[in-house]
Amino acid sequence: MAPMGIRLSPLGVAVFCLLGLGVLYHLYSGFLAGRFSLFGLGGEPGGGAAGPAGPAASADGGTVDLREMLAVSVLAAVRGGEEVRRVRESNVLHEKSKGKTREGADDKMTSGDVLSNRKMFYLLKTAFPSVQINTEEHVDASDQEVILWDRKIPEDILKEIATPQEVPAESVTVWIDPLDATQEYTEDLRKYVTTMVCVAVNGKPVLGVIHKPFSEYTAWAMVDGGSNVKARTSYNEKTPRIVVSRSHSGMVKQVALQTFGNQTTIIPAGGAGYKVLALLDVPDKSQEKADLYIHVTYIKKWDICAGNAILKALGGHMTTLSGEEISYTGSDGIEGGLLASIRMNHQALVRKLPDLEKTGHK
């Protein structure tokens, strides 16, 4: 007789055993899922490793959220800027030359470039391991570090861009300039210095960040998304103020005066990021104002991608001097010079400046 007078039939024993096996199965599968999540093998689709600081893209590529990429890009530019400022204020730059530019000037590099590059690159690479990242400075594998993002999107970004903007990770290329205007940085001309991040999708610039480390001003924008910066209310198209590189202002001045007249003003400045901000409504007293940005020589894509994205998001244009759109895939530089404008007839300006590219090759 069974205990307490209960008699179990063969069918009851079988049901009891099946229930027991079911309980054991669920307990064991839950244990395995927990173990897998610790190694990044579980989690939501497209979410990478579980946990608040895990990658924002799945291990097999998947998709990335451009809104998240913007948040990380802003943080990367600021973190890089902190390194740039710290090195400059220490007055120990460890300055050296990487070689010569096409114009024969020293292509300088400092500790500020290197340390900013490390912070910016690894913050973006840890958050988005599946995307292609191009940066001006060499990334040394021996310096590798994991810099985690807390997955928080700032309120100003959420206010402008309310919903996620997902794109295939394989379509994304990131361009980093860890210290724009290195020459001016070594001369302690701080207002020209910026750190920049750009995200291109299928070669088209879609989001840009330009950060000024010494005034702590940051401009960002996403094409068809939102921005924290805007165009000025008016521009002078007839006799514009033209911002150009300090190294070849004389080349541009001669042609500009012939094109727009003797009232045209040429503003020599350092740094492509600074020059783009000169076209916008920027609340920084050290920032000069211009109506056009012209560049006549070879330039690298990490110098201009962020500015291109910001101008495009605000309805402006950045093209070669012949009016061609710039693709941010393939090689890291462009040969055709540069013309940037906003709230102007850009193609009419292109037609007015037929000889500037030739001027840059003299």
UniProtKB/Swiss-Prot annotation:
GO terms for biological process: phosphatidylinositol phosphate biosynthetic process; skeletal system development. Its cofactor is Mg(2+). It is found in: Golgi apparatus; Golgi apparatus, trans-Golgi network membrane. Pathway: Sulfur metabolism. Contains N-linked glycan resistant to endoglycosydase H. Gene3D superfamilies: 3.40.190.80, Fructose-1,6-Bisphosphatase, subunit A, domain 1. Mg(2+) 3 binds at residue 136. Residues 34-362 are lumenal. One of its GO terms (cellular component) is endomembrane system. The chain crosses the membrane at residues 13-33. Residues 88-109 are annotated as: Disordered. Residues 1-12 are cytoplasmic. The keyword Transit peptide does not apply. Glycans are attached at residue 262. The active site is at residues 113, 182. It catalyses: adenosine 3',5'-bisphosphate + H2O = AMP + phosphate. It holds the Pfam family Inositol_P. Its main location: Golgi. This is Golgi-resident adenosine 3',5'-bisphosphate 3'-phosphatase.
